[in-house]
Amino acid sequence: MKKVFIRTFGCQMNEYDSDKMLAVLAEEHGGIEQVTQADEADIILFNTCSVREKAQEKVFSDLGRVRPLKEKNPGLIIGVAGCVASQEGENIIKRAPYVDVVFGPQTLHRLPKMIVDKETSGLSQVDISFPEIEKFDHLPPARVEGGAAFVSIMEGCSKYCSFCVVPYTRGEEFSRPLNDVLTEIANLAQQGVKEINLLGQNVNAYRGEMDDGEICDFATLLRIVHEIPGIERMRFTTSHPREFTDSIIECYRDLPKLVSHLHLPIQSGSDRVLSAMKRGYTALEYKSIIRKLRAIRPDLCLSSDFIVGFPGETEREFEQTLKLVKDIAFDLSFVFIYSPRPGTPAANLHDDTPHEEKVRRLEALNEVIEAETARINQTMIGTVQRCLVEGISKKDPDQLQARTANNRVVNFTGTPDMINQMIDLEITEAYTFSLRGKVVEA
C-alpha cells in the first residue's frame, strides 16, 4: 500500500483539493496510507497557496527539506500542487529539479497518470492547464469520516481585484452543475455528515446549470440544500459583497439550518482604497448589507478579511478601517499586511509606507477585533448551544471538541459515541479563542 504525505497551505478550497488528491490516489492504488512524517512516504505532496509571498516561499523551504529524502530514495515521488504550481509552472522544476510532478487546482484528477508518466519516461511532468469543470467529472465519490464536510460548488474568480492572484492561478469563475452538487451532498448525508460547508472563491456568483438547461443561482441552491434529509447545518465560504443579493440575505430569514455566522471579506474601510483594490463597492454599501442581515438575524456573527498597508494607504484611511471595524463589531477575523503578488496590477503601485507602520496597523486592528471576539464569548456563558462534536480536543486528549453554529470551538467532557453527533452544550467558561462547556442531559 502506497504511503502518502501531504502538506496543505492556505484556504479551505485547498483542504478540499487535498482530500480529493488522496481520493484519486486511493482509487488508483486500491487504497493508500496517509502518513504524518515525510520520511515515511512513497509520495510527498505540497498543496500550495500563492495569496501571500510568505506562504509561497515556505513551499520552496519545505521542498529543500525533503530533497535529501529524494537523494536517498530516487523512487520517491515529490509533487507540487495548488496555486504556486499554477503560477510558477516549469520554474518549480528549474528551481527544484528533484520535483517529479507539478499540477494546478484544475488538473489534480490527472495526478495518477502524471506519476505513471514520470516513472515511465523519467521526465518531470507539468500540467497547469485550465480544463474547467473536467476535474469534477473524474473525481471518485466523496468518502468522509467526520460529521462535517466541504463541498466545492464552483471554482475560480472573475472579479480581478488589483491585489489578488486567484484569477490567474485558479482561472475564471465556473460553476458545477446543480445535480452534481446535490448528488455529492446526498451521498455525504448518507455517510452520516450533519454539516455541509459550500466552497468557492466567490460562492454567491454560483450559476449552476440544471437538467432542463435553466440556471440555478446561489440563493436557490441554499434553499434546495436546506431540504436534503440528514443535513442539519449549512455554511458557505467565501463570498463577495458585490454579489451578496437580497435573495441571499432572505435565506437568513427563511432557512434555520443556515448558521448564524458569515465570513464576508471587506478588506478596507476606506472608499479610496477599496476603489484602488477594484473591489466594486463602498464601505456604506457593505454596511447596508450587514444592516439588512442583522435586521432579520440579530445574533449573526460576522468575520472578515482585512489588508493593511495597501500601497498609498494613509493614516486617515487606516483610521476609517478601524472605525468601520468598531461600528460593525466584527468577530474573529483575518488581518494581513499587504503582500505584492507578481502579475497583479497592485504590484506596480508605489508603496511608501514603512514596514514598521504596517505592523503597527496590523496589531491595532487585531486588538480591536480580538476584544470584540472576547466580548461575544463572554455573552455565551450560561447559554445552551447546539454543537457538532468534531473529535478529540486539540488541547486535552481526555476532552472532546465541538463547534457551535457561530463557529466557536467548545472543549468538554464527553464519551466517544458523541463524536460526529449534534449535541447540546451549556457554555461554562469563555476564553479568547475557545469555550468550555458541559453536556446538557436530555
From Swiss-Prot:
Cellular component terms (Gene Ontology): cytosol
Co-factor(s): [4Fe-4S] cluster
Limits of the Radical SAM core domain: 143-375
Protein residues bound to [4Fe-4S] cluster 2: 157, 161, 164
Catalytic function, reaction form: N(6)-dimethylallyladenosine(37) in tRNA + (sulfur carrier)-SH + AH2 + 2 S-adenosyl-L-methionine = 2-methylsulfanyl-N(6)-dimethylallyladenosine(37) in tRNA + (sulfur carrier)-H + 5'-deoxyadenosine + L-methionine + A + S-adenosyl-L-homocysteine + 2 H(+)
Gene3D superfamilies documented for this protein: Methylthiotransferase, N-terminal domain, tm_1862 like domain
The protein's enzyme class: transferase
Subcellular location(s) of the protein: Cytoplasm
GO molecular function terms noted in the UniProt entry: 4 iron, 4 sulfur cluster binding; metal ion binding; N6-isopentenyladenosine methylthiotransferase activity
Family recorded in the similarity comment: Belongs to the methylthiotransferase family. MiaB subfamily.
Residues that bind [4Fe-4S] cluster 1: 11, 49, 83
Domain MTTase N-terminal: 2-120
The protein's name: tRNA-2-methylthio-N(6)-dimethylallyladenosine synthase
